[in-house]
């Protein structure tokens, strides 16, 4: 079913909005994927906050024109699914993880920070831990010296006699 001019413009406007908010774009060829597998991929993408769209390539080219994703315009050929993500690594993770289990999904490339990513670039981006994991690792590094100091002080107190002893009551309180 072909779209009329106003419907095409609506699609372009929607994808332009996605591209404006997104940090990452991943493109993958989906030739031969069953409807059930595509539904599973879309569900996984939705759970991770990734917008997956099957678009006509000419509409996709027009939508990314003038954005940071314009660098991939030359690669927009064939049956492609486009994954836009506001998280820097989410789109790459979803597509790369699904491609590991389904050989019919072939990663074609992507873009991040205005630079073209080839297949290996997308896979490397997918291997980067998520923002939450990185923050947890930084917190762990910051907490490590304090926890080590507490352990050393606890061991030192145990060695010297079991920690702070009870202080005797003042003489005035005993006399009263």
Swiss-Prot record:
GO annotation terms (biological process): translation
InterPro entries in alphabetical order: Ribosomal_uL10, Ribosomal_uL10-like_sf, Ribosomal_uL10_bac, Ribosomal_uL10_bac_type, Ribosomal_uL10_CS_bac
Keywords: Ribonucleoprotein, Ribosomal protein, RNA-binding, rRNA-binding
Top-level taxon of origin: Bacteria
Example of a GO MF term: structural constituent of ribosome
GO cellular component, one term: large ribosomal subunit
Subunit structure: Part of the ribosomal stalk of the 50S ribosomal subunit. The N-terminus interacts with L11 and the large rRNA to form the base of the stalk. The C-terminus forms an elongated spine to which L12 dimers bind in a sequential fashion forming a multimeric L10(L12)X complex.
Family under the similarity heading: Belongs to the universal ribosomal protein uL10 family.
HAMAP family assigned: Ribosomal_uL10 (MF_00362)
Function, as annotated: Forms part of the ribosomal stalk, playing a central role in the interaction of the ribosome with GTP-bound translation factors.
Protein name (database record): Large ribosomal subunit protein uL10
Organism: Polaromonas sp. (strain JS666 / ATCC BAA-500)
Lineage: Bacteria, Pseudomonadati, Pseudomonadota, Betaproteobacteria, Burkholderiales
